[in-house]
Amino acid sequence: MKQRLLENRLRAGFVKWVTQGNGLAVVVVVFFFAFGLLLLTLRQRHIDNQELLVRQDAQTSVGDMQLRLRGDIDYLLLLAKERADEKLTPESFLRIGSQYVADHPELINITWVDKNLIIQNVAPLQGNRQIIGLGISLPEPARASQAARQTRQPVYTDVFEAIQGGYSFEVWVPVFRDNQFKGLFAGVYSLGKLLKYALPLQVQKNNYFEILDENRNVLAEFGVRQNVFPQVSKVAPISPFGNGVTLRVTRFGNEFWSQNLIVLILVCSGLAMGLVYFMFARL
């Protein structure tokens, strides 16, 4: 009996406390706490979704770049076979090589080098004529050409700064006939053009791209630094480059805390507070 009487007094005291307006503060605090927790949960889900998308886009980008490079090697191997079989003349090389470079703008040119490592021809000729007759003197091309000759396999240079400016890399493919070295072909690339032309369009429109060296210095970039998530990016190694060269993909998009969302939060908060006040005013 006494316990029931005590419970009734406590209940009556709580109702009185609520009706006096003290409960309004508690309800408002609980509402905003729950609302804030909901927003934080939604924001984390938003970030997780962006991270998943940028990770997938990075994998797609690296995969497409490698497929593009693999296709170029296959073409250079075909040229090497035609040259070894003495079916490729300088004239036909200029014609088909120039067309291939036009169709694959990540390439600057394709260079024909003889067994003495002297440049004999280059496709396209326009803009590259001045290198004919030169030897292979730059450290990375010299290393890769010798390695390709020794291994009889295509060999990439590391990324290096080109004389013309910007960063470049090359792939060297040897030419042998009856175990006799005949020379090489070199595919000469622009790192910036590789980013621009070797990536799928659906990935380009959603991301900002950078190629970095081992010290995280930017070697090439593509895209506009606008509306990007600095915290939502993915770094992936680019095979076959050495020296820790990586591709960093940063996601485009709007921040979770956008202006429209903030306005919506303020409106909802105002409506909720007005509703709570109206309910307690009628008690």
Predicted features and spans:
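Juxtamembrane amphipathic/hinge helix adjacent to a transmembrane helix
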Residues: K2-N8, S233-N254
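Extreme N-terminal signal-anchor transmembrane helix of membrane signaling/transducer proteins, especially
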Residues: Q3-D48, I265-Y277
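Amphipathic, soluble alpha/beta structural segments
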Residues: G13-W17, D57, S61, E161-E170
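Membrane-interface helix-start motif
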Residues: W17, A198, R248-C268
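Juxtamembrane extracytoplasmic/periplasmic/luminal helical "stalk" adjacent to the first N-terminal
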Residues: V27-L88
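Intrinsically disordered, low-complexity polar/acidic regions
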Residues: D85-T246
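Cytoplasmic juxtamembrane amphipathic helix immediately C-terminal to a transmembrane segment
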Residues: F278-L283
